């Protein structure tokens, strides 16, 4: 089967975990992994798997006309520089940084709206874990306000996450509104230093217009099943608890352990969502994409 050639920029934890996921894809071929440090462990791993590598950064990607999709797993500032260069080169950018140059992408909610975009942003780990639940509740109950608390193992939060705490909360809150449909969104992140490290937990509070418990639970259960198609470790820890017009739901995410440890579910859900988005976009380029169940809850 023909595959779409793709590149990964950024051979760190996120980029390396993403690489392992994309190696299983039926529609994407990783043609290149690039970084800026010749001795990078991620580049060495890629080479050991037979993937071409370069330490010349984005320049190496721009020189390859056959590469159609580029996953940017660097940081917000580099992506702001990369985005216009990739656009000019006619390449699709899937942005795993907080830069948010393109529209927010939560595959299970709004893939069809942005399938032909040349740059999409994967929001945040908290966004990928919670926006679908808010969208599901909003569809049947009307969400006036959504507040999420993402608790992550401190060990899973590298320097990039720690430097981007403000961007995390702002981007996640905005995505709760723009993609999830909430009238107002708020996000809080907690880095938990407990040993052994905790799994990623997300508590989702919503205030709704129509607190129909049966409809809300049905919508959430269906959404969880759909997310599990690409994030097997995603599970409903506490099913929707309806108290008046307040609905509380708790989600746990366990990582697949492709490269990162299972407790790093926050990173795993980002790479899983990016791989899912990339694969669906590749299917469109190959002319084989067919919407399933109307991949939009908006």
Curated annotation (Swiss-Prot):
Record's keyword annotation contains tRNA processing: no
Protein's GO biological process: catabolic process
Alphabetically ordered keywords of this record: Aromatic hydrocarbons catabolism, NAD, Oxidoreductase
Disulfide bonds: none
EC number in record: 1.2.1.10
Catalytic site positions: 125
UniProt GO molecular function: acetaldehyde dehydrogenase (acetylating) activity; NAD binding
Catalysis: reaction(s): acetaldehyde + NAD(+) + CoA = acetyl-CoA + NADH + H(+)
InterPro entries according to UniProt: Acetaldehyde_dehydrogenase, Acetylaldehyde_DH_C, NAD(P)-bd_dom_sf, Semialdehyde_DH_NAD-bd
Binding-site positions, NAD(+): 156-164, 266
Keyword check for Oxidoreductase: yes
Pfam assignment, any one: AcetDehyd-dimer
CDD domains per the UniProt record, alphabetical: ALDH_C
NCBIfam families assigned to the protein according to its UniProt record, in alphabetical order: ac_ald_DH_ac, PRK08300.1
Protein family per UniProt: Belongs to the acetaldehyde dehydrogenase family.
Name assigned to this protein: Acetaldehyde dehydrogenase
Organism, scientific name: Pelotomaculum thermopropionicum (strain DSM 13744 / JCM 10971 / SI)
Name of the gene this protein is made from: mhpF
């Amino acid at each position: 089967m023909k595959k779409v050639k793709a590149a990964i920029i950024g051979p760190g934890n996120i980029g390396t975990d993403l690489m392992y996921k994309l190696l299983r894809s039926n529609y994407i071929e990783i043609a290149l992994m690039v970084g800026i440090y010749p001795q990078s462990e991620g580049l060495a791993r890629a080479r050991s798997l037979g993937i071409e590598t370069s330490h010349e950064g984005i320049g190496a990607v721009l020189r390859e006309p056959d590469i159609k999709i580029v996953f940017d797993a660097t940081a917000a500032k580099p992506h702001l520089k990369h985005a216009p260069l990739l656009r000019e080169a006619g390449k699709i950018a899937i942005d795993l940084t907080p830069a948010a140059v393109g529209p927010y992408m939560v595959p299970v909610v709004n893939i069809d709206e942005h399938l032909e975009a040349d740059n999409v942003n994967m929001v945040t780990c908290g966004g990928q874990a919670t926006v679908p639940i808010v969208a599901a509740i909003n569809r049947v109950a009307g969400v006036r306000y959504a507040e999420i608390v993402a608790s992550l193992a401190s060990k899973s939060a590298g320097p990039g996450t720690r430097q981007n705490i403000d961007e995390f909360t702002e981007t996640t809150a905005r995505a709760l509104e723009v993609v999830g449909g909430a009238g107002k969104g708020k996000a809080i992140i907690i880095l938990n230093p407990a040993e052994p490290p905790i799994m990623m937990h997300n508590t989702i509070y919503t205030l709704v217009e129509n607190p129909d418990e049966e409809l809300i639970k049905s919508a959430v259960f269906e959404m969880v099943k759909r997310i599990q198609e690409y994030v097997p470790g995603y599970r409903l820890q506490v099913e929707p608890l309806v108290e008046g017009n307040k609905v509380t739901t708790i989600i746990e995410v366990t990582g697949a352990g492709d490269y990162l440890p299972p407790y790093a579910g926050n990173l795993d859900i980002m790479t899983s969502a990016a791989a899912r988005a990339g694969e669906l976009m590749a299917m469109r380029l190959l002319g084989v994409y067919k919407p399933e169940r109307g991949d939009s809850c908006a």
